[in-house]
Amino acid sequence: MARSVPPADTSATPLSPPSKPVALQALSTNTLGAWAGGSFSTGDLIGNIQRAQMGLVGLRYHRLLIPSPSKTETGGPTLTYTVDMFPVLLLSIPPNTVAPPPARKEPGPEESSVYQEGMDAYGFGVGPAGLRLTSRVAKRVQPFVGGSTGLSYFSQPIPNGLGRHLNFMFGVGAGVQIVLTSDLILTAGYRYYHLSNGFRGQINPGIDANLLHLGVAMSQ
């Protein structure tokens, strides 16, 4: 006599939702980071002082604007607002790069020393208005483009006594951010920086810097 087989349990076992990629886990509304950069050459799009060198250390806050973290399952582009604090700004101008004062004007000590000897200045600044557009946010390697603008204050007038301590600065650039863990992100990129007093001084030659930067960020 055949043994009866108990009916199979047809109740469906709920499946656990697939886990998000690490890159999406790292995507957060708020992110804090630190970065540093240095120039490898000067440009001449706007600024006129050549062979100047610029270095900086920055602290950055990121605020995700579009879309929210819950709506990025497809890995589409995101728009982020950034704020930078620069506790360290370094600027070096070599000799014979700032045009001397007109022959009819007697140069002051600060003007002549910069023209003959160059100058090194130290300062700090803030970049309260920045935007970054990042793509492929579901991947570990994510390209981005961005820009920011702000103010800087130096230990002496830039580029000499005819300039100003307070200067405007803005930069645009591109790079990649690499998601190392769900909490840690590495960034590397290039930025074109411009620094000038906005025609508030007696002279305003301006400085353009091609800058490479490296940083880390922590998701909150």
Summary of predicted features, one role per range:
Residues M1-L24:
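Cleavable N-terminal export/targeting peptides
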Residues K20-T29, L65-L79, R136-P143, L180-L184:
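Short loop/turn motifs that connect adjacent beta-strands in outer-membrane beta-barrel proteins
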Residues N30-A34, P77-M85, P143-T149, F168-F170, ...:
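Transmembrane beta-strands of outer-membrane beta-barrel proteins
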Residues A34, G38, V57-R63, V126-S135, ...:
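Residues on the lipid-exposed face of transmembrane beta-strands in outer-membrane beta-barrel proteins
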Residues A36-T42, R63, M85-L91, T149-P157, ...:
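Transmembrane beta-strands of outer-membrane beta-barrel pores
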Residues I46-N48, L91-M119, Q156-L162, R200-I203:
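Flexible, solvent-exposed loop segments that connect beta-strands
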Residues G206-Q220:
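Outer-membrane beta-barrel "beta-signal"
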